Amino acid sequence: MKKLFLLLLCLALCFSAVGCAVDSAPEKEQASSSQGNSNNEAPQTFGLNEAAVFSNLKFTATELSQSEGKDFFVPKDGNVFVGIKFTIENLSNEEQTISSLLLFEGYVDDVKTSWSVSANCVFDEGTLDGSIAPGKKLVGWYSVEVPANWKTLELQVLNSIWSNNSATFVFQNNK
């Protein structure tokens, strides 16, 4: 009887672990009511004012800004600060924790870059760090220091630190 109970317990734990690990890829929120065929083979990219919708969170990049710094916070010679303002909405029934260091990974012209404290002080309307109550939003900046002649900034965003699913936001330098 003990072996049967132990076997059932192990099976239940295995199914629970598999169920927790299943996560869906983000979907692009449609701007219009017409829906075309979606091709899930190619990875989706998102841009300004496009929403990546995961099962529990919705990420929308709402603004891109470039700065040469202010006060004591200036980039190295030949660099600029770039900030992307995001609105993150909690779609779940549970509180969600956001960390700009753990959920975001940046690349400038295919070279890894990291979140910059100095850049974030320039874009001082808040960071993308904190807890979001169910149905509420978090608005803040993800900021990096990049070469002044940058062409493409790519941000890969995870919906949780336990997930492998990500959305890729791509921004072009129009200056």
What is the predicted function of each stretch?
Residues L11-A12:
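Repetitive helical segments and hydrophobic/amphipathic motifs
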Residues C20-K175:
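Conserved functional micro-motifs across diverse proteins
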